[in-house]
Each structure stands twice: as C-alpha cells, then as structure tokens.
C-alpha cells in the first residue's frame, strides 16, 4: 500500500466516504464510478428533508427516505459477500455491508443538514443523528431500527467504568477502515479470491505492523497461492508470538513435521 493512501486512512480530516472509495480502488483495481448514484441519493434525500425545519422530524423523514423509499432496510447477516463491500455493486444489489453502509448514510445525512456521526455501541458501529443538545437518534445501519434509552442503557452496561461518566465514542476513521477491510478480507477468503484477500492483509499490516493474527492470515493466503516457503515465516511468527493460542499449538505441530528446505506444498 502506498504512503499516500496510508496517510489518507490515518487522517481524520478527510471525507470518510471518499477515503473508502480510494480503498476500494486500491483493492479492486478499478476506479469507483458511483458519483452519479451518490448524487441522486443525496438529491432525493435533500428534496425529502429540505422543507422540514424541526430537527427530530427531519431525522425521522431522512431515515424513512433511506430505509423505506430507497430500500436500505436489510436483515443482519453473519457473513457479507464481496459485492456488499464494493459501493457500486452494493447499491445496485441493495446489499451494503455494515461499516460501508454506516459511512454512506453518514455522508448522506450530513449533506441533508442532519448532524451525524458513527459511534461504537457494544458490540457494533451505529449511527447517531444529533437533533439538539438533549436528544439524539441512535440506529442500526443495517436494519434502520433505533435504540430506545433502555436498550442503550443495557448495551452500555457492558462497558466498564463509572456509569455516570460513560459516553458514546465517535469511531475514528482508521477503526472504521480496519473493520471494513477485515470483513472484506473474510469475504474474499470465503469466495477463494486469495489474491485480493492478500491485498486486504497487506493493508491491515500496514496499519498494524506485525499483528500476529494478520501474519497468520497472510501465511495462509501465501500457502494457498503456492508460496509456502514465504508463508512458513509468517506461520512461524504467529506460533512464536501466540504460543498459548490453540491454533498456534496445532500449527506448531504441523510446522515441526515440515522440512522447509525440500518441501513445497501444493
């Protein structure tokens, strides 16, 4: 990954959706061509909300415009496909992975004068539209369902610390990117697109150098691409860094049986 893209990801000054489109261009090797669709979405939502002066009502109209009119409503999924991580195909199929969808909705909402950010609510990223000093709507980017105060309180009870001092943290762009690329990597692996999965791992390692689990995954991908001698070093690093991990213990037994000098696995 080039230094310019890495700097874009780490910066908190850049428009998040544009950063995600740059990542998409790097991984898929094609320039994103979704500006017309984005402009249409923003234009539609602005037309629906422009005449609504009251902030809470404007937020509700916006959510309805996106999840009902534009068919953004979806069901939670354990695994998201590759196409759901690429904005053009995701919009075409009305199937957008959670983090990408959160970034997209935040972009549209802010363009509609709804002050919106992405916050971490255990265990997921959710959208928050701030209506005034005392009221905000927090909702799931996948289903569009909002949390009431009781549901929010139950979720926040999972966070350690003084309950009177716990606040919702705005997710940094780098955290959103890490979660998005990790999900995309898993989708590529499920679909056996190992070359593209390797691009994801390289990006993750650029952001978190020598993460043992990413080194393990890179070893697996290199192994699948018949580069076992290179993969061996990553496997060995994972075993050394995480000796108590059950996967590392099993992998060590396998590595001990291999003579790296004369064995190439296919």
Show which residues each predicted segment covers.
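A structural boundary/capping signal
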Residues: 1-266
